[in-house]
Amino acid sequence: MSEKTVKVQLVKSLIGTRESHRATVRGLGLRRLNSVSELQDTPAVRGMINKVSYLVKVIA
């Protein structure tokens, strides 16, 4: 059975954000603006996305 995945895209700049939020975005594998990362759909990843929901967009 294939693993469920989720794609996230960084849509807002990290300038002026909290250090913990920058670390969370980095943990999601996002570096530059508009970069996309495909991750396994786990509760931990969902929590990270929820924490920085104002910076990222789920695209798939």
From Swiss-Prot:
Entry's Gene Ontology molecular function annotations: structural constituent of ribosome
Similarity comment: Belongs to the universal ribosomal protein uL30 family.
Residues of the signal peptide: none
NCBIfam families per UniProt: rpmD_bact
UniProt cross-references to SUPFAM superfamilies, sorted A to Z: Ribosomal protein L30p/L7e
UniProt keyword list: Ribonucleoprotein, Ribosomal protein
GO BP term, example: translation
Disulphide connectivity of cysteines: none
Keyword Protein transport: no
Pfam families hit by this protein: Ribosomal_L30 (PF00327)
GO cellular-component term (any): cytosolic large ribosomal subunit
Name recorded for this polypeptide: Large ribosomal subunit protein uL30
Gene: rpmD
Quaternary organization: Part of the 50S ribosomal subunit.
Record has Nucleotide-binding as a keyword: no
InterPro entries referenced in this protein's UniProt entry, alphabetically: Ribo_uL30_ferredoxin-like_sf (IPR036919), Ribosomal_uL30_bac-type (IPR005996), Ribosomal_uL30_ferredoxin-like (IPR016082)
